[in-house]
Amino acid sequence: MASLLANGISSFSPQPTSDSSKSPKGFHPKPESLKFPSPKSLNPTRPIFKLRADVGIDSRPIGASESSSSGTSTVSSTDKLQQYFQNLDYDKKYGFVEDIDSFTIPKGLSEETIRLISKLKEEPDWMLEFRFKAYAKFLKLEEPKWSDNRYPSINFQDMCYYSAPKKKPTLNSLDEVDPQLLEYFDKLGVPLTEQKRLANVAVDAVIDSVSIATTHRKTLEKSGVIFCSISEAIREYPDLIKKYLGRVVPSDDNYYAALNSAVFSDGSFCYIPKNTRCPMPISTYFRINAMETGQFERTLIVAEEGSFVEYLEGCTAPSYDTNQLHAAVVELYCGKGAEIKYSTVQNWYAGDEQGKGGIYNFVTKRGLCAGDRSKISWTQVETGSAITWKYPSVVLEGDDSVGEFYSVALTNNYQQADTGTKMIHKGKNTKSRIISKGISAGHSRNCYRGLVQVQSKAEGAKNTSTCDSMLIGDKAAANTYPYIQVKNPSAKVEHEASTSKIGEDQLFYFQQRGIDHERALAAMISGFCRDVFNKLPDEFGAEVNQLMSIKLEGSVG
């Protein structure tokens, strides 16, 4: 343990080092103190649900006129990348602010704040008690300082914890949703109306602190699938919520999980009954609109024995000059023989090229493979946020259960990302696979932090981990912190890592064959990320390939 502490992870929360029949909560290794610049980030464009597979990439060099030749440019590749990213107009596509008539509670965090949120959500007494207990735990915990991220202290009294449109919709009918809100999501590329909405994906649209619409509910109900906002689920399905809320991520799991448990206002709930295959992918689109308001959503997905569900998640926020906090919790429960595939394209506003503004994205995501032969897969593309801090994890409790993690994390300018995963092997013959790709450009810092833990009763556990980093330019940094704990001699654990750099000689090689900087970078980055892109669902695949080939050409962030 001493050598692990010296090598640099301290409090890599939420999982335990000791064997336990309960869901693990944490081991806390201490990292060396690293001096990073204050959080800053990039200006990206990232469509989420609006797929455009037909869009190509301009074959001209970045910043060149139509008459320019790809072989005559004297601008360096790094300059071209920065020039290219400055031309990406996140502000126009997602950075706008809609003037929505909203009700916002006063700033500040206290028991009265929590009581007011619970009252506004029309919650039962047991839910208010859950919140109060979480808040009491939050007050006793200290904000973790062990990550590679560096940012000013957060003033939790100087933000709003609830903001919602005054015209409250009846979620059973899209006809009663405020037309302004429907038009708002249309502009974001998330159509909700009957005529325009995505035909084969059920969407729960969340703005600030409330869900404003959920599509395809009747179709899902025919299969017995429950898909609604978690606020509605607390009122309509209290027995299910009592059984599963906090079962995978306890309210005292970590600092931000405790905060979320106290003040979460909405999110999505999905329940797939026994031996049911969800007839379509389900998805949630999160949008922050109000200034100085944090978003604290809660997602709970339960897949009973023999069921299957695919979940998609996307998000954007306006281009504010100030930072905003997004502290979410995601819990996945997987029964015997069930499977959950969870895919995310994280597209929060990352700030401007000087690092002003952007979202602090501090998220706890964990899945529990509770039953034998169950499977949970996390696939994520992280391109936004001024700071990203998250470790989607899987606890492999059932025998022969499987956990997978596929990730691309992109940072540019002064963005910071400390992300990775944890695979906790508890059952017999469990398997896990980790593929992580990190791309860093500008002055950004990109850290992969991963834990593979094989507990003493996990006979025949197997893990393979691949962690690759790519650097663009000479000022970015990439760190990899693999953490391996094996307590059973029958385990087979493999880990490999690499760091590469896109250099002028490689780009010159492409140019000699008539391929300009833009296409050369797109080709190299696309190939670098292929193992992860291939795991994305079709609903994301076309968009992410375009996103990477365009934005990643400088490393996106």
From Swiss-Prot:
InterPro entries on file: Fe-S_cluster_assembly_SufBD, SUF_FeS_clus_asmbl_SufB, SUF_FeS_clus_asmbl_SufBD_core, SUF_FeS_clus_asmbl_SufBD_sf, SufBD_N
Main location: plastid
Gene Ontology MF annotations: ATPase-coupled transmembrane transporter activity
Entry keywords, A to Z: Chloroplast, Plastid, Transit peptide
Range annotated as the organelle transit peptide: 1-52
Disruption phenotype annotation: Plant have an enhanced hypocotyl elongation in far-red light, and accumulates protoporphyrin IX.
Function recorded in the entry: Involved in light signaling, probably by mediating the transport and correct distribution of protoporphyrin IX, a chlorophyll precursor, in response to far-red light.
Protein name as it appears in the record: Iron-sulfur cluster assembly SufBD family protein ABCI8, chloroplastic
Originating organism: Arabidopsis thaliana
